[in-house]
Amino acid sequence: VPVRGMSEQLVDVLEQDKQCTNRQGTSKTGNLLIIGRKGSGKTVLAVDVVKAIQKQRKLKQGKVAIITGDSLNKKKIKEIVSKLYGGALIIEKAGRMNEKTVQRLNKAMERDTGELLIVLEEQRKPLDRLLSSNKEFRRKFTSRLEVPIFINDELVTFGQTYAKENGFKIDEVGILALYSRIDMLQREDHVVTVAEVKEIMDEAIEHVQKTNVKKIVKRVLGKGRDDADRVILSEKDFNI
Protein backbone atom coordinates (compact mmCIF):
# COMPACT_ATOMS: atom_id res chain seq x y z
CA VAL A 1 0.00 0.00 0.00
CA PRO A 2 1.57 3.36 -0.97
CA VAL A 3 2.12 5.41 2.17
CA ARG A 4 2.30 9.19 2.18
CA GLY A 5 5.90 10.44 2.37
CA MET A 6 7.47 6.97 2.54
CA SER A 7 8.69 6.75 -1.09
CA GLU A 8 10.87 9.84 -0.67
CA GLN A 9 12.30 8.53 2.59
CA LEU A 10 13.08 5.13 1.02
CA VAL A 11 14.83 6.76 -1.94
CA ASP A 12 16.96 8.78 0.52
CA VAL A 13 17.87 5.68 2.56
CA LEU A 14 18.93 3.75 -0.56
CA GLU A 15 20.90 6.73 -1.89
CA GLN A 16 22.69 7.21 1.45
CA ASP A 17 23.56 3.51 1.51
CA LYS A 18 24.99 3.73 -2.01
CA GLN A 19 27.08 6.80 -1.09
CA CYS A 20 28.38 5.25 2.15
CA THR A 21 31.86 4.08 1.14
CA ASN A 22 33.73 4.30 4.44
CA ARG A 23 32.46 1.19 6.22
CA GLN A 24 35.73 -0.66 5.45
CA GLY A 25 34.21 -4.04 6.24
CA THR A 26 32.74 -2.87 9.56
CA SER A 27 29.33 -1.59 10.72
CA LYS A 28 30.70 1.66 12.12
CA THR A 29 28.45 3.76 9.86
CA GLY A 30 25.51 3.46 7.44
CA ASN A 31 23.07 1.79 9.84
CA LEU A 32 19.34 2.52 10.04
CA LEU A 33 16.74 3.73 12.55
CA ILE A 34 13.03 3.03 11.97
CA ILE A 35 10.72 5.12 14.14
CA GLY A 36 6.99 4.59 14.47
CA ARG A 37 4.14 3.95 16.87
CA LYS A 38 3.31 0.49 18.19
CA GLY A 39 1.47 -1.53 15.53
CA SER A 40 2.52 0.76 12.66
CA GLY A 41 4.17 -2.04 10.68
CA LYS A 42 7.83 -1.18 11.48
CA THR A 43 9.10 -4.76 11.20
CA VAL A 44 7.46 -5.44 7.83
CA LEU A 45 8.96 -2.16 6.60
CA ALA A 46 12.38 -3.04 8.06
CA VAL A 47 12.48 -6.41 6.25
CA ASP A 48 11.50 -4.77 2.93
CA VAL A 49 14.12 -2.03 3.31
CA VAL A 50 16.82 -4.55 4.23
CA LYS A 51 15.99 -6.61 1.12
CA ALA A 52 16.17 -3.48 -1.05
CA ILE A 53 19.54 -2.50 0.45
CA GLN A 54 20.92 -6.03 0.04
CA LYS A 55 19.79 -6.05 -3.59
CA GLN A 56 21.51 -2.71 -4.15
CA ARG A 57 24.68 -4.05 -2.48
CA LYS A 58 24.41 -7.05 -4.86
CA LEU A 59 24.08 -9.53 -1.99
CA LYS A 60 22.20 -12.49 -3.41
CA GLN A 61 21.47 -14.37 -0.19
CA GLY A 62 22.09 -11.93 2.64
CA LYS A 63 21.19 -13.36 6.04
CA VAL A 64 18.55 -11.46 8.03
CA ALA A 65 17.66 -11.97 11.70
CA ILE A 66 14.99 -10.25 13.80
CA ILE A 67 15.38 -10.06 17.58
CA THR A 68 13.93 -7.91 20.38
CA GLY A 69 16.08 -5.71 22.59
CA ASP A 70 15.07 -7.87 25.59
CA SER A 71 16.20 -11.09 23.93
CA LEU A 72 19.46 -9.52 22.77
CA ASN A 73 20.31 -8.74 26.41
CA LYS A 74 20.49 -12.52 27.01
CA LYS A 75 22.58 -13.37 23.93
CA LYS A 76 26.27 -13.34 23.08
CA ILE A 77 26.63 -10.39 20.71
CA LYS A 78 29.88 -11.67 19.18
CA GLU A 79 28.24 -14.96 18.17
CA ILE A 80 25.22 -13.25 16.58
CA VAL A 81 27.39 -10.82 14.60
CA SER A 82 29.61 -13.66 13.44
CA LYS A 83 26.63 -15.82 12.33
CA LEU A 84 25.08 -12.92 10.42
CA TYR A 85 28.38 -11.80 8.84
CA GLY A 86 27.58 -9.56 5.86
CA GLY A 87 23.80 -9.77 6.44
CA ALA A 88 21.42 -7.72 8.58
CA LEU A 89 20.22 -7.62 12.17
CA ILE A 90 16.83 -6.01 12.90
CA ILE A 91 16.35 -5.15 16.58
CA GLU A 92 12.69 -4.66 17.56
CA LYS A 93 11.89 -2.67 20.73
CA ALA A 94 15.51 -1.52 20.66
CA GLY A 95 14.90 0.77 23.66
CA ARG A 96 14.87 -2.33 25.86
CA MET A 97 18.56 -3.06 25.28
CA ASN A 98 20.49 -2.56 28.50
CA GLU A 99 23.72 -0.55 28.83
CA LYS A 100 25.96 -3.62 28.66
CA THR A 101 24.30 -4.86 25.45
CA VAL A 102 24.64 -1.44 23.80
CA GLN A 103 28.34 -1.28 24.72
CA ARG A 104 29.02 -4.79 23.42
CA LEU A 105 27.09 -4.18 20.21
CA ASN A 106 28.88 -0.85 19.74
CA LYS A 107 32.29 -2.58 20.02
CA ALA A 108 31.26 -5.46 17.75
CA MET A 109 30.14 -2.98 15.07
CA GLU A 110 33.66 -1.53 14.93
CA ARG A 111 35.22 -4.90 14.08
CA ASP A 112 35.04 -6.87 10.82
CA THR A 113 31.33 -7.61 10.35
CA GLY A 114 31.26 -7.97 6.56
CA GLU A 115 29.43 -4.59 6.67
CA LEU A 116 26.53 -6.13 8.58
CA LEU A 117 23.54 -3.75 8.50
CA ILE A 118 22.03 -2.98 11.91
CA VAL A 119 18.44 -1.72 12.05
CA LEU A 120 16.98 -0.37 15.30
CA GLU A 121 13.21 -0.03 15.43
CA GLU A 122 11.36 1.64 18.24
CA GLN A 123 8.87 4.33 19.22
CA ARG A 124 10.36 7.83 19.38
CA LYS A 125 10.72 8.39 23.15
CA PRO A 126 12.41 5.08 24.11
CA LEU A 127 14.74 5.40 21.10
CA ASP A 128 15.69 8.98 22.01
CA ARG A 129 16.42 7.84 25.58
CA LEU A 130 18.63 4.99 24.35
CA LEU A 131 20.62 7.08 21.87
CA SER A 132 21.02 10.23 23.96
CA SER A 133 22.92 8.27 26.61
CA ASN A 134 25.09 6.44 24.02
CA LYS A 135 26.43 9.09 21.64
CA GLU A 136 29.18 6.97 20.09
CA PHE A 137 26.62 4.27 19.32
CA ARG A 138 24.19 6.87 17.92
CA ARG A 139 26.76 8.12 15.37
CA LYS A 140 26.75 4.71 13.68
CA PHE A 141 23.12 5.20 12.60
CA THR A 142 23.23 7.60 9.68
CA SER A 143 19.85 6.85 8.05
CA ARG A 144 16.35 7.02 9.45
CA LEU A 145 12.80 6.21 8.37
CA GLU A 146 9.76 7.61 10.14
CA VAL A 147 6.50 5.69 9.73
CA PRO A 148 3.75 8.33 9.52
CA ILE A 149 0.45 8.29 11.39
CA PHE A 150 -2.11 6.93 8.95
CA ILE A 151 -5.27 8.84 8.05
CA ASN A 152 -8.53 6.88 7.73
CA ASP A 153 -8.40 6.74 3.91
CA GLU A 154 -4.97 5.07 4.05
CA LEU A 155 -6.15 2.59 6.68
CA VAL A 156 -9.16 1.63 4.54
CA THR A 157 -6.88 1.24 1.48
CA PHE A 158 -4.69 -1.08 3.58
CA GLY A 159 -7.81 -3.09 4.55
CA GLN A 160 -8.84 -3.42 0.88
CA THR A 161 -5.34 -4.53 -0.15
CA TYR A 162 -5.18 -7.02 2.74
CA ALA A 163 -8.57 -8.46 1.69
CA LYS A 164 -7.47 -8.79 -1.94
CA GLU A 165 -4.22 -10.55 -1.00
CA ASN A 166 -6.26 -13.10 0.97
CA GLY A 167 -8.80 -13.77 -1.80
CA PHE A 168 -11.56 -11.43 -0.58
CA LYS A 169 -13.13 -8.19 -1.76
CA ILE A 170 -14.99 -5.58 0.31
CA ASP A 171 -18.20 -4.34 -1.31
CA GLU A 172 -19.16 -0.64 -1.21
CA VAL A 173 -21.36 -0.89 1.88
CA GLY A 174 -18.66 -3.02 3.53
CA ILE A 175 -16.14 -0.21 2.89
CA LEU A 176 -18.46 2.25 4.69
CA ALA A 177 -18.74 -0.21 7.60
CA LEU A 178 -14.91 -0.46 7.73
CA TYR A 179 -14.65 3.37 7.82
CA SER A 180 -17.17 3.35 10.66
CA ARG A 181 -15.21 0.73 12.68
CA ILE A 182 -11.96 2.70 12.24
CA ASP A 183 -13.70 5.95 13.19
CA MET A 184 -14.99 4.39 16.42
CA LEU A 185 -11.43 3.44 17.40
CA GLN A 186 -9.90 6.86 16.65
CA ARG A 187 -9.66 8.96 19.82
CA GLU A 188 -7.73 12.03 20.89
CA ASP A 189 -5.38 9.87 22.91
CA HIS A 190 -5.27 6.92 20.51
CA VAL A 191 -4.35 6.77 16.82
CA VAL A 192 -5.56 3.67 14.92
CA THR A 193 -2.72 1.51 13.58
CA VAL A 194 -2.31 -0.90 10.67
CA ALA A 195 -2.22 -3.76 13.21
CA GLU A 196 -5.71 -2.83 14.45
CA VAL A 197 -7.11 -2.69 10.90
CA LYS A 198 -5.57 -6.12 10.24
CA GLU A 199 -7.45 -7.38 13.33
CA ILE A 200 -10.75 -5.94 12.01
CA MET A 201 -10.11 -7.58 8.63
CA ASP A 202 -9.26 -10.95 10.22
CA GLU A 203 -12.51 -10.83 12.22
CA ALA A 204 -14.54 -9.99 9.08
CA ILE A 205 -12.86 -12.81 7.12
CA GLU A 206 -13.47 -15.26 9.98
CA HIS A 207 -17.13 -14.16 10.13
CA VAL A 208 -17.72 -14.67 6.41
CA GLN A 209 -16.07 -18.10 6.60
CA LYS A 210 -18.36 -19.22 9.43
CA THR A 211 -21.40 -19.14 7.16
CA ASN A 212 -24.01 -21.86 7.34
CA VAL A 213 -24.50 -24.59 4.72
CA LYS A 214 -27.21 -22.63 2.90
CA LYS A 215 -24.84 -19.73 2.31
CA ILE A 216 -22.04 -22.06 1.23
CA VAL A 217 -24.36 -23.54 -1.42
CA LYS A 218 -25.23 -19.99 -2.50
CA ARG A 219 -21.54 -19.20 -2.88
CA VAL A 220 -20.88 -22.43 -4.81
CA LEU A 221 -23.60 -21.30 -7.22
CA GLY A 222 -21.66 -18.11 -7.74
CA LYS A 223 -23.44 -15.72 -5.42
CA GLY A 224 -21.33 -13.87 -2.87
CA ARG A 225 -18.27 -13.80 -5.13
CA ASP A 226 -16.98 -11.26 -7.64
CA ASP A 227 -15.76 -11.81 -11.25
CA ALA A 228 -12.27 -12.73 -10.00
CA ASP A 229 -13.86 -15.41 -7.75
CA ARG A 230 -13.05 -13.47 -4.59
CA VAL A 231 -15.42 -13.87 -1.64
CA ILE A 232 -17.30 -10.64 -0.93
CA LEU A 233 -17.02 -9.05 2.51
CA SER A 234 -20.14 -7.00 3.24
CA GLU A 235 -21.48 -4.74 5.99
CA LYS A 236 -22.65 -7.60 8.26
CA ASP A 237 -19.10 -9.04 8.33
CA PHE A 238 -17.83 -5.81 9.91
CA ASN A 239 -20.73 -5.21 12.29
CA ILE A 240 -19.96 -8.08 14.65
Task: Provide a role label for each language-model segment.
Residues A52-L84:
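AAA+/P-loop NTPase substrate/partner-engagement loops
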Residues Y162-K169, L176-I240:
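C-terminal alpha-helical "lid" subdomain
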